[in-house]
Amino acid sequence: MPTIQQLIRKPRQPKVKRSKSMHLEQCPQKRGVCTRVYTTTPKKPNSAMRKVAKVRLTNGFEVISYIPGESHNLQEHSVVLIRGGRVKDLPGVRYHILRGVLDTQGVKDRKQRRSKYGAKRPK
């Protein structure tokens, strides 16, 4: 434990809070270009083929982001908008691609939670 004199000389430093989605640089979303679209498998208790894309952002960072919903139209050079939010069972995936924005189509025949998947209201 430091003495009062030591604290006067060198005060305590506040802990730096690190962002969980630092490549967004405090923005709610960022635009980027897909450099690779592929599937990967989740961690131990789960089993699936999760769709992910490697995206080069406008600020130069390259991040791995998750493509939510059933089926997608993304391929290399597609322009996408990403938001923060990790996928718990995919290590290294800390971002989500927004559906129904820019080159990404919304999910077809989606009835519930449509706004999250860029689906229009069914007639």
UniProtKB/Swiss-Prot annotation:
GO terms for biological process: translation. InterPro entries: NA-bd_OB-fold (IPR012340), Ribosomal_uS12 (IPR006032), Ribosomal_uS12_bac (IPR005679). Keywords: Methylation, Ribonucleoprotein, Ribosomal protein, RNA-binding, rRNA-binding, tRNA-binding. Residues 1-28 are annotated as: Disordered. SUPFAM superfamilies: Nucleic acid-binding proteins (SSF50249). GO terms for molecular function: rRNA binding; structural constituent of ribosome; tRNA binding. One of its GO terms (cellular component) is small ribosomal subunit. With S4 and S5 plays an important role in translational accuracy. Interacts with and stabilizes bases of the 16S rRNA that are involved in tRNA selection in the A site and with the mRNA backbone. Located at the interface of the 30S and 50S subunits, it traverses the body of the 30S subunit contacting proteins on the other side and probably holding the rRNA structure together. The combined cluster of proteins S8, S12 and S17 appears to hold together the shoulder and platform of the 30S subunit. Part of the 30S ribosomal subunit. Contacts proteins S8 and S17. May interact with IF1 in the 30S initiation complex. Belongs to the universal ribosomal protein uS12 family. This is Small ribosomal subunit protein uS12. The gene is rpsL.
